[in-house]
Amino acid sequence: VKILIVEFITGGGLAAEKAPESLAREGDMMLQALLAELNALKGLECAVMLDWRYQNNISEQTLTKIIVQENENFYQVLARTLPDYDVFWPIAPETDHALAEMVRLSAEIGVKCAASCLSAIDLCSDKLATMNVLKSVLPVPETRNLTVFTPEFPSAWVVKPIDGAGCEQTILVSDRQSYRQCLAEIDRPEAFIAQRYVAGKAISLSVLFKAGQAWLLCCNEQQIKIDDNHFVLMGCRVNSAIDHLASYHNVIDAIARSIPGLWGYVGIDLIEIPDRTHTGKHQLRVLEINPRLTTSYAGIQAATGINVAEQVLQLFDGEPDMTRLRNETVTLKL
């Protein structure tokens, strides 16, 4: 089986412009982990597309490398490369419809794609639309488009791109001065949302989905700091938070039913807060759904022994084997 792996940032999606360093680091971390897992499997012939600046990031001799030069159009290179492969595995942010465009292209060319269906990707690429779908089945923070947002202080709010990835342009607004500073940074308010700030533990769920079913790989604790009102992802503790497994399963089952087009690996960001009325209990708020590999993925095999790539490919023909070989916490630093 010939498989083409393309991570958007390091794979040439921004070949003609400066790539954001934080997203390039995260992208490279996910790409290296995916290639290592695929390399451990028999019967696969792997190729990877690489931005001309990142072509030396991959040292694996058995891989085919397709280099995207500075003057080349990323989607044209992808379109002429895809027909040579049986399976396409995109890793891309939802930003500017990058993930959707890559999946759409593979569908047009007729190459099997290790990703959610386009309708699910389009929905999850719009954080406001996602919250509107989920709010009838799960607790979510109040979310509004920035164009119709009137700040109500002393409540704090988080302003972020409607299609953002990572912590890019994610800003805490807690008073009128910080709100004015926030607006001064933003070119297109219609492309941003304001979400009521929920103080608590930032966690993410790593999940496999298929046809309305969900399998929990692990729960992770995200290490986020706020620097000059900007959120910064410092790293994550993979397979760390296992206090509330039943609640996590309820969340992923509700999401699977609400968005049955989710397929393969998906990351779900939540905030976990203590329940003040019940000692020892907690509440969850779902913040967003990322229909793609997330940074936490890079530590899952070390933490659990599960080869996630193998189980995703297994989804084409059946169900994944979630048997753990170990149960450890792995810390990833960014």
What are these regions (language model features)?
Residues V1-L4:
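Extreme N-terminal starter segment of soluble prokaryotic enzymes
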Residues G11-E17:
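Short N-terminal binding/cap micro-motifs at the start of the first secondary-structure element
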Residues K18-L38:
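Short catalytic helix/loop segments, enriched in acidic residues and glycine
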Residues V48-R144:
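Conserved N-proximal alpha/beta basic substrate-recognition cap immediately N-terminal to
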Residues V87, T277-G280, E310-L334:
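Peripheral (often C-terminal) accessory segments that flank ATP-dependent C-N-forming ligase machineries
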Residues L118-A202, F209-A214, G235-H249:
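Active-site nucleotide/adenylate-binding loops and adjacent lid/helix of ATP-dependent enzymes
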Residues R196-G261, E272, R276, N290-F316, ...:
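ATP-dependent carboxylate/phosphate-activation module, predominantly the ATP-grasp catalytic core
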Residues K281-R285:
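Conserved protein kinase catalytic/activation segment
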